[in-house]
């Protein structure tokens, strides 16, 4: 869930200075002793080559313009974030964490390369290549360490059908599912991860005591309470209500990217952010028309939620520290949170744009790959400004569309109804509804129609970046489907020389028809239809795979280097 030249100065990047088969509790030993420097598992792929796909980029913490008290507050927020990083590893791959720690003082470069690739992925599984194990002996299971080893979705569904009173416990986004004899139980996160949540909550309260912003301090105290109860509702309301804060944090288990078993379990993520006020102010144009775009969506009126919460906060921030699911694998350049549909109905959502991460991605990845794969005149249309606009509307669009599904005449949670494919469906909906919203803004004269080619070219260049190393990750699955649909509609064609071109006359119609399909799938909560749609459109075409094979000189993503270190325990 995820901006630039309109907001960013030229050359901004320079200023950036740059589950295994055995799933243990985080508080019990793994099945075998931690490996030593001489006995670690052998790589199953060329780790040096994998690391070379990432561009290291420094994301420093600049204290310029901050008081000593503010610097201390930021450091307390980071301290709390490091506790949540320790939890994330235990959700993702406890045995991978044991190996990461065991290799800390190993002297050989090969061992440090393994350790660094473990850090990039937060596990022994390549998050950008379909969770493919990259070390011998690692066996991936859906749902990582959030479920018992060997369990299947069918087993869970059959158990819940036989024990309906257990459904809320098993499907709760904030429980770890475990076996208890022949039964399944859901252990609350605040119980399972208490050893890390208690110090994290204390650090948040310490940060609150250092804040001169009373509303932000109040939010931090509420969020500290939420960590110890798994009830984030009150603190989420306070978070969305923050008015142009100088500092902000993402600090919760929000996203379900680790859970490809049921698609409901959340993992912890953290971003410590410092606001860029001048860039944030430029988002006003988009904020003004959010409810109008919602009204204009190709969706039945009954499926459109109340607009009472719109428009909602949008902020451009630098993020000098991230951890958990915001640190590993796909490096988000923006976010749209919280995910609670109750908050959507009452307040909407907060859209956050990570300026330093956006700069790095566009300069180092998106524009270079577009120049290799797109027809040259169209590749030159892709820009920081275009990509920014596409990402802004993507994040706005996560909060648009149905808030609930209609299932058997009743309201149902969309995420639960759709199942594991939900993450990909929702990312695609945000992409396509975002483009639909840009078309609406241009048709209403809010944005100049001359920008259309810029927007479309920037989005297509972004598709190539997202899918080039596989289509298992949610964003890649979404954009692979979009690409194939656009090709089917002749909105994207392939020239005789193998370069791709956009048919600018057909593209808006293809966007509108795809928006209708995706919104309707969410509104009806049809898992069968969602899975069939991605089955039809989700495969990488051979000719695109061959074209992407020529992009080896372009990084797959950035590898952020912060001023704070990892400090995982």
Regions from the PLM with identified roles:
Residues 1-21:
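Sec-dependent N-terminal signal peptides
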Residues 27, 32-125, 130:
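N-terminal mature-domain "stem" immediately C-terminal to a signal peptide or N-terminal signal-anchor/transmembrane
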Residues 47-59, 64-74, 83, 163, ...:
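Fold-level signature of zinc-dependent metallopeptidase catalytic domains
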Residues 91, 207-211, 525:
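Secondary-structure edge/capping motif, primarily at the C-terminal ends of alpha-helices
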Residues 100-189, 503:
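Amphipathic heptad-repeat coiled-coil/leucine-zipper-like oligomerization helices
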Residues 435-531, 536:
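Long, well-structured alpha-helical subdomains associated
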Residues 515, 519-569:
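Extended, compositionally biased alpha-helical segments that mediate assembly or anchoring
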